């Protein structure tokens, strides 16, 4: 099998596929409150295009798929998309990232269609604050979605918490306490300068050392744990005696580019080899031409930078490549 390898020796076996740029929420770090123009439906990859693309990609070593958005559960055919991917025997793992507003209703059907596990965005455990950060989200719906995911066996369940200075950094110990009784992995993620002009994002940025400081202040003893299924770049720990775990993902202060194994496919059909760079290539004209399609994918991988230099934005230093100005919802979170 010819593997998708870049010039730095990184083998790519994982792809994140955005199935929509639309979302029912407007999280402060992801989307503006208003003024967004969404893709017309005919510009969004169809189920058949996604499945056809993946039937080819598995021949080159891709074996893990994460479905993203926008909010992927807004797709009326999301169960059929999962079922189509699940019918490809080479795919070992199908996961989804969701805000969980509709997860309680759809978890069982998704599990039956072949979904393996789920990542859920949850940035506050206080209903009013959660509503403010998401601009309209209902915390109870997320909690119901988590419970349903547990019931149907979507495991491991991971909760993504974007740490936002002045908004949820006083809830760190609450999230850590959440792991004591539930076999859940809570992942604290640095606030990233994706699609944000200027330096205003720095006002909300906190280094993830804050997590360990909170542990120490609360008297929580913690220890490293082995890799969690599908853990990617997360460094994982367990508070002694807890059922669940917590992890930290620091794309800004300590990037993990040297072990990056992923590609991204946007909802409108552009392949991106690096989240943070503008370069992207349109696959749609070549869906029915396997040779040209794989040449395009390999070209994207060949052009992948050694690292994204995102940390330079912390020091206002010049970057050698042009960062992306698509928002996360437009790329695929």
From Swiss-Prot:
Pathway: Cofactor biosynthesis; molybdopterin biosynthesis. The keyword Lyase applies. GTP binds at residues 16, 66, 97, 158, 262-264. Binds 2 [4Fe-4S] clusters. Binds 1 [4Fe-4S] cluster coordinated with 3 cysteines and an exchangeable S-adenosyl-L-methionine and 1 [4Fe-4S] cluster coordinated with 3 cysteines and the GTP-derived substrate. Its EC number is 4.1.99.22. [4Fe-4S] cluster 2 binds at residues 257, 260, 274. S-adenosyl-L-methionine binds at residues 29, 70, 121, 192. It catalyses: GTP + AH2 + S-adenosyl-L-methionine = (8S)-3',8-cyclo-7,8-dihydroguanosine 5'-triphosphate + 5'-deoxyadenosine + L-methionine + A + H(+). Residues 7-221 form the Radical SAM core domain. PROSITE patterns: MOAA_NIFB_PQQE, RADICAL_SAM. Monomer and homodimer. Catalyzes the cyclization of GTP to (8S)-3',8-cyclo-7,8-dihydroguanosine 5'-triphosphate. HAMAP family: MoaA_B. This is GTP 3',8-cyclase. It comes from Listeria monocytogenes serotype 4b (strain CLIP80459). The lineage of its organism: Bacteria, Bacillati, Bacillota, Bacilli, Bacillales.
